[in-house]
């Protein structure tokens, strides 16, 4: 019967690891969604400590620049479709971002962190 207690501990640990990992993920933002020079969605609201993943779409190259937050920015251009940049937000606030090559075309957005 000792193996049942070990099995219970292992199953509980596995469940908690999946649950905690799922809670940290907040949103996926597509860069160049549908071949357009847009972020989709271009506005999201998340909780502090959560992660937003930016995924390069069909129309590269793109980058992500957060005004006043160089530590969150990904200035290198993403050329490969499907390339991802995860960004974790630890402080509440409004974080405006843009794609530098396409900001003039309106490729901008904001993340609200509660």
State the predicted function of each range.
Residues 1-11:
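Bacterial N-terminal signal peptides that target proteins for export
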Residues 2, 20-114:
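Extracytoplasmic copper-binding redox domains, predominantly the cupredoxin/blue-copper superfamily
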Residues 9-19:
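Bacterial N-terminal signal peptides
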């Amino acid at each position: 019967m000792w193996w049942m207690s070990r099995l219970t501990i292992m199953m509980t640990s596995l469940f908690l690891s999946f649950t905690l990992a799922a809670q940290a993920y907040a949103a996926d933002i597509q860069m160049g969604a549908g071949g357009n020079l847009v972020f989709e969605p271009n506005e999201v609201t998340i909780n502090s400590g959560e992660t937003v993943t930016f995924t390069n779409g069909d129309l590269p190259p793109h980058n992500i620049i957060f005004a006043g937050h160089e530590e969150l920015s990904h200035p290198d251009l993403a050329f490969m479709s499907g390339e991802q940049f995860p960004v974790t937000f630890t402080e509440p606030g409004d974080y405006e971002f843009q794609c530098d090559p396409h900001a003039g075309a309106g490729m901008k957005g904001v993340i609200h962190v509660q």
